[in-house]
UniProtKB/Swiss-Prot annotation:
Its main location: cytoplasm. Participates in chromosomal partition during cell division. May act via the formation of a condensin-like complex containing Smc and ScpB that pull DNA away from mid-cell into both cell halves. It comes from Enterococcus faecalis (strain ATCC 700802 / V583). Component of a cohesin-like complex composed of ScpA, ScpB and the Smc homodimer, in which ScpA and ScpB bind to the head domain of Smc. The presence of the three proteins is required for the association of the complex with DNA. The lineage of its organism: Bacteria, Bacillati, Bacillota, Bacilli, Lactobacillales. GO terms for biological process: cell division; chromosome segregation; DNA replication. This is Segregation and condensation protein A. Disulfide bonds: none annotated. Belongs to the ScpA family.
Amino acid sequence: MSFLQEINLKLDVFEGPLDLLLHLIQKLEIDIYDIPITAVTEQYMSYIHAMQTLELEVAGEYLVMAATLMAIKSQMLLPKQELEIIDDEDFFEEEDPREALVAQLLEYRKFKYAATVLHEKEEERKLYYTKEPMDMDDYKEEDTTLPPNQINTIDLFLAFHAMLEKKKNRQPVETTVASDDVSIEEKISAISERMRQVQKGKAVSFDSFFDSYSKQEIVTTFMALLELMKTGAIYAEQENNYSEILLFNTETQQEDTTEVEETQ
């Protein structure tokens, strides 16, 4: 079994391809009724390619959606035609190839919202007791909405893919496995130590963790960063869709003006 095959990481980021598409639409701040299919397809394929680079299993439904997006993109590139019917002044325009996808997204968003409301009601119901009212403030759920500029693991996947593309342009990524393998646990320990040394109010550039051109080293580092984000030890911020991603130590970070730590 290869090194990458031994990696066992479950990423509960999305419930399916429609969930991923909704995230991308929100991230790109676009109108769901007028989806720029080229931009969305590029972002979607970046996520798929990142998963394949890490040799993580990509569910078939994601690949089906990828094929659907590519088909829609191809149709959108074809010259628009108008079919004349009976009266020369009346025209029947071709159906927008995005129409079926938009309908699916709207339907999914509706049911997702309903599921969220039902879950909130269920959680509220758990706080009801058949005794005298009492202060339940200490038992309220924390707000899980990410603060402004803070990003989640899917954005990190997209940044990871972009970083790999930049490395390919500079020098091919080595695919051989070195004899002195570093485990994910060891890499987590090394990254944690580095983050502990970061002063309050400062951040570390995401790209600064990827000096190596070894595929094993790159993948191990990325897996370690994902695990640290999952456990809440670190968090990531990005000012806008194309700016640098910064990593912060959750324990020591304060609401100060941040500076990017120089690459060590």
